[in-house]
């Protein structure tokens, strides 16, 4: 083993986390075996015995959205029964999707010292964060992923703080998804018999947004680790663009089995987040999902997390309780909910249970 690699492996946390090399830096050194810090417990690895190969999440064609009410019904049904679905003919130009994927690769190919300007200790703002794994300080085993997280406040702040390697493409992707997000939420609210989205509800449903750029390098011994561990998102909705490599798995509702989300060129993956599960009083389901590591290819994904504002109180919508439903969830300050999520390692649906009424 070369001396440099031996030194890195003896100080992986410094190399990967503190020096900004990320797991990409490890992979670029030509590792032949997975470092022990990334070996996941067996119960956290996905196996062929738990995967259903002949099933997958719904794919919904939005081309007739304006004229066919069945499209809205399909969206609501998918949110109830799966919590995940793919959309095609959504109106976001293919070139916008391809450009943001190219920009993601461009950022992660920057030198470590350039990326490290945006790490937790160096970034001029908490709204811009480059990092690795999920919460390295709280994890027993690290996840095989690097990320750039960009919390959107304004175009002016983005121009000043977001990395120039990907800033314009990320903003363009977000802007192009806005109309789709609003229509999806309108359909989902209609399914709850909520006919008016006033300013308060708009804040609860889409008051803030965060876009992540995720990079999963090819991995030695991918069967021993994970790209992302089991979790549900804390968002209202997540709008996910994935590349053609694949590797995203979704847990079937009320089951211990998983299904693959196959890449479809031009499609966008939509999933219900915890906030919408709580707002809908459990009608719409945020579902556990995970990403496996890949031994042959690098993989990227670009999710937009559509969230309440940090100072919003989330709880079952008044219209549902006024119709006689019993509240399943308590009212929670959204920023407290998010802090609870990020203080620990990925742990399935534990965070949404935090908001349940016992």
From Swiss-Prot:
User: Any idea which positions bind 2-oxoglutarate?
Assistant: 216, 299, 301
Give cofactor(s), names only: L-ascorbate; Fe(2+)
Domain Fe2OG dioxygenase: residue ranges: 200-308
What EC number(s) has UniProt assigned to this enzyme? 1.14.11.61
Taxonomy, superkingdom:
Eukaryota
Q: Which GO terms describe its molecular function?
A: 2-oxoglutarate-dependent dioxygenase activity; metal ion binding
Tissue expr: Expressed at low levels in tubers, underground stems, leaves and petioles.
Q: How is the cofactor bound?
A: Binds 1 Fe(2+) ion per subunit.
Q: What does the record give as the reaction this protein catalyses?
A: (E)-feruloyl-CoA + 2-oxoglutarate + O2 = (E)-6-hydroxyferuloyl-CoA + succinate + CO2
Pfam families, sorted = 2OG-FeII_Oxy (PF03171), DIOX_N (PF14226)
User: What pathway or pathways are given for this protein in its record?
Assistant: Phenylpropanoid metabolism
Q: Which UniProt key words apply to this protein?
A: Dioxygenase, Iron, Metal-binding, Oxidoreductase
Q: What induces it?
A: Transiently induced by fungal (F.oxysporum f.sp. batatas O-17) and chitosan treatments, in association with the accumulation of umbelliferone and its glucoside (skimmin) in the tubers.
Protein family membership: Belongs to the iron/ascorbate-dependent oxidoreductase family.
Purpose: 2-oxoglutarate (OG)- and Fe(II)-dependent dioxygenase (2OGD) involved in scopoletin biosynthesis. Converts feruloyl CoA into 6'-hydroxyferuloyl CoA, and, at low efficiency, caffeoyl-CoA into 6'-hydroxycaffeate, but has no activity with p-coumaroyl-CoA.
What's the protein called, per UniProt? Feruloyl CoA ortho-hydroxylase F6H1-2
This chain's source organism reads Ipomoea batatas (Sweet potato)
